[in-house]
Amino acid sequence: KAWAFNGQADMTDKPLLSVRAGQTVRIRMNNRSRWPHGMHLHGHHFRQMLLEEQMGPLRDTLLMQPGEISEIAFVADNPGDWLLHCHMVEHAAAGMMTWLKVT
């Protein structure tokens, strides 16, 4: 597989994160590739963390440019198992997908 989250390609039995409903979650992503990635989170809307702890608009997809490091934040208010993946189908099929558990 060509893509990974925390060194793990494809869906695993263990979620990237397991959080309780109501928790604030922050996920830092680093695009170490030469390609853009439309990172999409199911089940929640998030805000991109900007300079000086400011937050961007609500969204469910963030386009990350090559070499970009970004952090998203959201309140985990929707219990379930939620997919986080690159919205470019070839990238997701090549391993750029994981999941979050909200209990």
PLM regions: where:
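Edge beta-strand plus adjacent loop/short-helix module at the start
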Residues: 1-37, 43-55, 59, 63, ...
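A short, acidic, flexible beta-alpha connecting loop/helix-capping segment that sits on the rim
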Residues: 78, 88-92
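Extracytoplasmic/periplasmic copper-protein system
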Residues: 62-66, 94-103
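Generic structural microfeature
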Residues: 22-24, 81, 95
